């Protein structure tokens, strides 16, 4: 897992574009971005997501290849990029808990 800038993320996206589209279209799909919360703490990152956004809004990447198939979404991983907010540990249906998404995380995800 390494910390990256938006400029690095943009380069990674450009470098992965052809491969991710080929993978998605092999299943008759368009490329998807899946936005998640990790159900972890603000500094807890997971390799299941291509991109993790910590509580400070810093961007962490688990791979150098955004077309790599990772286990972020059941039966929807091929041709998809998983983006997770490091947040929502112990969240409940009506309460996001002590680790609710921060304004900075939401801004960076947007």
What function would you assign to each model-found segment?
Residues 1-110:
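Active-site-adjacent loop/helix surface patches within enzyme catalytic domains
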């Amino acid at each position: 897992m390494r910390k990256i800038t938006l400029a690095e993320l943009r380069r990674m996206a450009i470098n992965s574009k052809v491969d991710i589209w080929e993978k998605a279209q092999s299943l008759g799909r368009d490329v998807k971005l899946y936005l998640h919360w990790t159900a972890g703490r603000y500094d807890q990152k997971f390799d299941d997501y291509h991109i993790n956004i910590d509580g400070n809004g810093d961007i962490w990447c688990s791979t150098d290849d955004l077309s790599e198939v990772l286990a972020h979404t059941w039966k929807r991983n091929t041709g998809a990029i998983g983006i997770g907010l490091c947040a929502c540990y112990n969240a409940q249906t009506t309460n996001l808990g002590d680790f609710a998404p921060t304004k900075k995380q939401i801004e960076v995800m947007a």
